[in-house]
Amino acid sequence: SRIFNRIQKLEKRLSPEFFSSLSAETLRDAGLSYSKVGYIKGIAGEIIIGKFNLRGLSYLTDEEVILEMSKQKGIGRWTSQMYLIFALGRPDIWPINDLGVVKGIIGLKKLEEFETGSKEISNLGDIYRPWRSIAARVFWQYQNISKVVSKVEPQLSNSVRD
């Protein structure tokens, strides 16, 4: 999100034209790797010339969106799932390869370690159908809150002793 915030300081309304107009160095200065700069500029160019239609994705099924987006260099299943959840608002996406979701599941459910993409994580998502995107958001939030609590708890226990 730091990178996103740095880019938004340059322009509030992000567009393919905006990314195409930026120099690679400007994007690098915002924190993007050389490969991500190439991917972003390539995708922006594809959108501008009409070879990649983001608006048209909303008419496709979830799997069709993933297949279509994955044709773009630098976009895979995880990125496609994030687009489905956050841009298209699809309710039943279960991002089993997302580290935040897995950490949230482990913490909230007090489970043993799981690997991202594991069959156990995939199966666990079945109980949340057809609202797995919402469950994923809960696990992300839990994981984010846990980070804050783990930083604050030692300070609280020290102040109680004083």
What are these regions (language model features)?
Residues 1-71:
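Alpha-helical ds-nucleic-acid-binding substructure associated with the helix-hairpin-helix region
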Residues 62, 77-162:
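C-terminal accessory module of base-excision DNA glycosylases/AP lyases that mediates lesion recognition
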